[in-house]
Amino acid sequence: MIIRSAEFVISAVQPSQYPDTDLPEIAFAGRSNVGKSSMINLLVNRKNLVKTSSTPGKTRLINFFDINGQLMFVDLPGYGYAKVSRKEQKTWGPMVERYLSSRKTLRGLMLLMDLRREPREDEFLMMQWCAHYDIPWKMVLTKADKFKKTAADRRRHEIARAVGIGADEMILFSTLQKMGRDPALETIARMTGILEE
């Protein structure tokens, strides 16, 4: 799948603000500071399509991006950042679940997790939502450059056991090393039914 164009469309909170489009959508979810913005930027080969921030909890809206005029990437707000106010933490769940439950054009979700961390309640909640709403999902293990290859693979198997899926169903990803871009794009092409070029 070759990405030729990528444009920001809109930021939304409520379903009434979502773009009125029939394009298939792929959502990106994960903890604050896991690397969602960096992953999207690498996939589209643009440095600043999605603004990256060293401040966790910065993305508090649902951001929509038009890719090739063929599909949409949807950047969901990061979860689990303690310094975000309690009120904002409480709005995260309903905002994200509303999107997952109501968006008929949603074709799949990329669930990002830092390879250095253990899966927590929020990751399991996202997996439960995907199962409940029948959304195909793929786990992407970010920051893989922090490990040597064998250690990264060992961590992948440990996390796979913890979440109950096969290690080969996960993508090791590193923005710095440009690792995992092709497998991620292949997954997105499969989920959306867009033929690879």
Swiss-Prot record:
SUPFAM superfamilies: P-loop containing nucleoside triphosphate hydrolases. GO terms for cellular component: cytosol. The keyword Nucleotide-binding applies. CDD domains: YihA_EngB (cd01876). Keywords: Cell cycle, Cell division, GTP-binding, Magnesium, Metal-binding, Nucleotide-binding, Septation. Signal peptide: none annotated. It comes from the Bacteria. GTP binds at residues 30-37, 57-61, 75-78, 142-145, 173-175. One of its GO terms (biological process) is division septum assembly. Residues 22-194 form the EngB-type G domain. Its cofactor is Mg(2+). Mg(2+) binds at S37, T59. GO terms for molecular function: GTP binding; metal ion binding. PROSITE patterns: G_ENGB. It holds the Pfam family MMR_HSR1. Belongs to the TRAFAC class TrmE-Era-EngA-EngB-Septin-like GTPase superfamily. EngB GTPase family. Necessary for normal cell division and for the maintenance of normal septation. PANTHER family: ENGB-TYPE G DOMAIN-CONTAINING PROTEIN, MSS1/TRME-RELATED GTP-BINDING PROTEIN. This is Probable GTP-binding protein EngB. It comes from Desulfosudis oleivorans (strain DSM 6200 / JCM 39069 / Hxd3). The gene is engB.
